[in-house]
C-alpha cells in the first residue's frame, strides 16, 4: 500500500520562479478574430492586401501570413462554438483595432475611399492627426476597428 502521509513533490511549495526549470518563452504569434460572415471578412481583408488562401471564404477557419512571421486568424462563430458551446459574441463597444501602416498619406486616403466605396463602414475620415500621421478608421464586417496610418513627414 502506498504511503499517503507525504505530499507528492509536485505539490510542494518551492522558491518563486519558473515551474519548468527555465523561463517559458511565449511569443506573439497571431491575432485571432471571430467573424460572423467568413466570406465578407476574407473579402474585406484581401482588399487590404492580406494573403488568404484560395477558397478561404468557404472555410470555417483560415489564416493569412503577415510580414515578420505573425498571422491573422479568422474563425467563424460556429467554429468557436464547436469547442466552446457557451461562447457568446462580445457586446458593447470595440476595444481593439488592427493598425495598418500605409506607404504614404495618399495611400491612407486611397485605401479608405476604396473600402468605403465598396460599402464598408468608414468610422473616421482621413485627417492629419496632431501626432504627425495621416490617420483614418474603418470597420471590418464585424465592426472591428481597422486603423490606417502613415507618417506625414517621410
Regions found by a protein language model. Give the residues of each.
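Vicinal oxygen chelate
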Residues: 10-23, 63, 112-154
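Core segments of cupin and vicinal oxygen chelate
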Residues: 33-81
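Exposed loop/turn and edge beta-strand positions of beta-sandwich/beta-sheet ligand-binding modules
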Residues: 58, 94, 132
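Mid-chain, well-packed structural core segment of small domains
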Residues: 98-112
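A short, acidic/glycine-rich surface segment
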Residues: 79-86, 124
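N-terminal beta-strand motif that seeds the catalytic metal site of vicinal oxygen chelate
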Residues: 16-42, 95-100, 151-154
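Short connector loops at helix/strand junctions that flank enzyme active sites
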Residues: 67-69, 91-95
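Low-acidity, Ser/Thr- and Arg-rich intrinsically disordered low-complexity segments
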Residues: 2-10
Amino acid at each position: 500500500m502506498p504511503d499517503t502521509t507525504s505530499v507528492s513533490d509536485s505539490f510542494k511549495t518551492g522558491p518563486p520562479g519558473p515551474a519548468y526549470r527555465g523561463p517559458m518563452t511565449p511569443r506573439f504569434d497571431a491575432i485571432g478574430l471571430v467573424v460572423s460572415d467568413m466570406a465578407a471578412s476574407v473579402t474585406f481583408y484581401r482588399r487590404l492586401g492580406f494573403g488568404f488562401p484560395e477558397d478561404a471564404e468557404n472555410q470555417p477557419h483560415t489564416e493569412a501570413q503577415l510580414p515578420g512571421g505573425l498571422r491573422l486568424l479568422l474563425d467563424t462563430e460556429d467554429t468557436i462554438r464547436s469547442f466552446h458551446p457557451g461562447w457568446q459574441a462580445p457586446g458593447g463597444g470595440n476595444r481593439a483595432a488592427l493598425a495598418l501602416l500605409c506607404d504614404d498619406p495618399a495611400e491612407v486616403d486611397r485605401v479608405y475611399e476604396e473600402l468605403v466605396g465598396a460599402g464598408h463602414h468608414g468610422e473616421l475620415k482621413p485627417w492629419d492627426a496632431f501626432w504627425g500621421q495621416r490617420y483614418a478608421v474603418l470597420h471590418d464586417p464585424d465592426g472591428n476597428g481597422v486603423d490606417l496610418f502613415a507618417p506625414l513627414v517621410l
